Swiss-Prot record:
Its EC number is 3.4.21.88. It is an enzyme of class 3 (hydrolase). The lineage of its organism: Bacteria, Pseudomonadati, Pseudomonadota, Alphaproteobacteria, Hyphomicrobiales. The gene is lexA. This is LexA repressor. It catalyses: Hydrolysis of Ala-|-Gly bond in repressor LexA.
Amino acid sequence: MLTRKQHELLMFIHERIKEGGVSPSFDEMKEALDLRSKSGIHRLITALEERGFIRRLPHRARALEILKLPDAASPSLAMARGRGFSPSVIEGGAQPKPSSRDLAPARSSGDTMTLSVMGRIAAGTPIEALQEESHQVSVPLNLLGSGEHYALEVKGDSMIEAGILDGDTVLIQRCDTATSGDIVVALVDGYEATLKRLRKKGDSIALEAANPAYETRIFGPDRVKVQGKLVGLLRRY
C-alpha cells in the first residue's frame, strides 16, 4: 500500500510525463507536494522504486519511468486523498495538525474509552507519516486527561530508557504546544513523524531519544510541529 504522499508524487509524475513527455524536476516535485526539502522527494522516489511503481533511467537527467499505477479503486488511497490530515504516523507524508473532524469520535463506556489507533509512530529515525485509522483500543479513563486523544503503535527502540518499547501502544493527548521535557509526537519538516522528548534550547528545538544509540537532533522552531504529547501507555504480554 502506498502512503498518501507516495501516491500524490506518483500521480504527479505520471501526469507530467503524460502531458509533456518528461518527468518533473525535483524542485517541481517539492513544490507540488509542499515539502521543505528535496531530501523528502528522494525518499519518496526511493520508496516508489522499491515498491516497483517507477524506475530511474541511468545516465539521463529527469528520467523516471512509470512502471505501474495503483488500483484506482483502492479504498485506502481514496480515503487518503479525500480527507484532511489525521495524526502523524509511520512510513509516509503528512500536513499540519489534525482537526477533530479527522478523528473517529472517542466512545466512553463505564470506566473505559475507545480510542482510534492511527497507525504506528517511529521511535527511532523519523519516517514518513501515514494518516489512517488501523483499529481501535479500549483505554482506562484514568489514563486520560481532558481534551482529545488518539493512540499510536510504537515502531523502534529509541525510547526504551523512557520505558517505551517497540510494539507498545502510546496514548496521545492532541495539542500543538508542549513543555520542555515532554515526550511528544513531533512532525519534522511537514512530513516526518517521530516520538521523542522535546527540549527547548534557546531558539532551537531538540528531539531527544531515550537510547544512547540515537543522537539528539536539533531543529529550528519552524521545522518542528507538535501534534500531541504522551499521557499513557498500553503493553501486551
